[in-house]
Amino acid sequence: MGKSILLINGPNLNLLGTREPHVYGHTTLSDVESNSREIAASHGAVLESFQSNHEGAIVDRIQAARGKVDGIIINPGAYTHTSVAIRDALLSVDVPFIELHVSNVHAREPWRHHSYFSDKAAGIIVGLGVYGYKVAVEHVCVNFEEKEKGAKAAL
């Protein structure tokens, strides 16, 4: 059976394509999810996506992933800067994760510069627009393939 990836998007990412397009672009979350599933499938992996504006729902979904997914890609949105609960959930399931941000959070308001996830993430993708999702999925899939060959991989 192929590897399994969980793609999680946090608050306001359901508005991709319409919310501040000068910052986030015009591609919708539905397009991002569909493209991500296609990329994963091209590597023999399955990608499931989940989006919520609610911290507890994200925690619940991460906990439900324990033992069922091989990698997580998460764009925590504004929870990046506030959520110890999501951080703790990610650490509790023992699944490597990639932290992803569409915008360059380090070039924005100073309060956006701190992340509760970066120090525990297997990798961080910042400021590549929605192309960052492609990079994240490709990275996770290539690392799955490298691990199957016995090579040391980051995820």
From Swiss-Prot:
Q: Name one GO biological process term.
A: 3,4-dihydroxybenzoate biosynthetic process
Pathway in which the depicted protein is active: Aromatic compound metabolism; 3,4-dihydroxybenzoate biosynthesis; 3,4-dihydroxybenzoate from 3-dehydroquinate: step 1/2
The question of whether Lyase is a record keyword is answered with yes
Give me the residues that bind substrate, please.
75, 81, 88, 102-103, 112
Q: Which reaction does it catalyse?
A: 3-dehydroquinate = 3-dehydroshikimate + H2O
**Site feature: Transition state stabilizer:** 19
Cited InterPro entries: DHquinase_II, DHquinase_II_CS, DHquinase_II_sf
Q: What does this protein do?
A: Is involved in the catabolism of quinate. Allows the utilization of quinate as carbon source via the beta-ketoadipate pathway.
Give the record's family classification: Belongs to the type-II 3-dehydroquinase family.
**How does this chain assemble?**
Homododecamer. Adopts a ring-like structure, composed of an arrangement of two hexameric rings stacked on top of one another.
Name under which the protein is recorded: Catabolic 3-dehydroquinase
